[in-house]
Amino acid sequence: MNYYTTKEIQERVDSYISQFKEGYFSPLSLMARMTEEVGELAREVNHYYGEKPKKASEQEKTIEEELGDMLFVLTCFANSLEIDLSQAFEQSMTKIETRDKDRWTRK
């Protein structure tokens, strides 16, 4: 199994997308794709943990697969807007760690 840094993920996706004339989709199209992938993830979570089992005719997918699809689309979105996901993550974690430091009961 390979493990990638966020930089490596962004570079691999960019290398893949750069092969094609069309390049990255527009931000609005990527947002629609992200929404589609979130819906597919929700469906899988509902099948595994909710009250709605899969039909016998439904294709077997996993939560892991859907999370991977979301990561791909998220990376496309970030790349198309020239956003470094490591920096975006650092900004978010700093905000969350400051804002929520006393919100939860510590172990």
What are these regions (language model features)?
Residues 1-67, 71-107:
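Flexible "arm" and connector segments at domain edges
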